[in-house]
Regions:
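Short S/T/G/P-rich N-terminal loop/turn motif that feeds into the first structured element of a domain
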Residues: 1-234
């Protein structure tokens, strides 16, 4: 079974970011101990919505997200504080549309590299690129993105690793959608990747099988990524 992921966009109310950052300290701590947890990596939007958060949650089995994480006393306590402080922009509560979630299976790629000395750092720069293929063409889109992973992986070696994550995620509900999750050591490293020949060639290769795309950028500040789940292999 492929690892299960949720990419969460959380739309905060004006000025809410400092309190969100506080709430995520215990949430990140408890997440790392949960049996199925592999990733729980959070950042602040840098595309003009500073009170919006972006988080990647990863689990060895979907039960970790739908049942395990929300069942913890820490989660219930912190979500109560979120509601009391009205940290969501439009509607409070777990059912709020301000929790904008996409559900994925890992398709291909890497979230960490064993030769990256900073692979566990909490302050990387993240770009999530959503792609939508024409009807019936997602398989080709996924294949093209996966070929790009291999080229990117081969382009760097220790000790000079700047591209820390380059993962192709297959959306579970939208059968035309895929997301490329990119994590670099800094924003400058992301800008360097964007202007590189290898990245431009990938975007060019994708054009025939891509109808629409969106780029969302964030600066990470807490969490863990690609750990072995405490429960062990599933």
């Amino acid at each position: 079974m492929p690892d299960f992921f949720v990419l969460a966009r959380v739309v905060g109310s004006d000025g809410a970011f400092p309190k969100w950052k506080e709430r995520l300290v215990p949430l990140c701590e408890v997440s790392a101990t949960e049996p199925y947890s592999t990733s729980y990596y959070w950042g602040q939007d840098v595309d003009g919505e500073p009170d919006t958060l972006w988080g990647l949650e990863g689990y060895a089995h979907p039960v970790g997200f739908f049942i395990g994480h929300p069942a913890s006393d820490v989660f219930k306590r912190e979500m109560k504080k979120v509601d009391e402080d009205r940290l969501l922009r439009h509607v409070q509560g777990l059912g709020s549309p301000d929790y904008d979630l996409h559900y994925y299976d890992m398709h291909y790629g890497f979230l960490t590299r064993p030769d990256d000395k900073d692979k566990d750092c909490k302050d990387s720069f993240v770009a999530a690129i959503h792609f939508w293929a024409p009807e019936g063409r997602r398989k080709q889109l996924l294949g093209t993105l996966s070929a790009g992973v291999d080229r990117v992986r081969a382009s760097e070696s220790a000790p000079h690793i700047t591209i820390q994550s380059f993962a192709v995620l297959k959306e579970c509900l939208d059968v035309n959608m895929a997301t490329l999750y990119i994590r670099t050591r800094s924003r400058k490293d992301w800008e360097t990747l964007q202007s590189s020949t290898i990245f431009k060639e990938l975007l060019s290769d994708i054009e025939p099988v891509n109808q629409k795309s969106e780029i969302h950028q964030s600066q990470a500040f807490n969490g863990h990524i690609d750990q072995n789940p405490p429960i062990g292999p599933v």
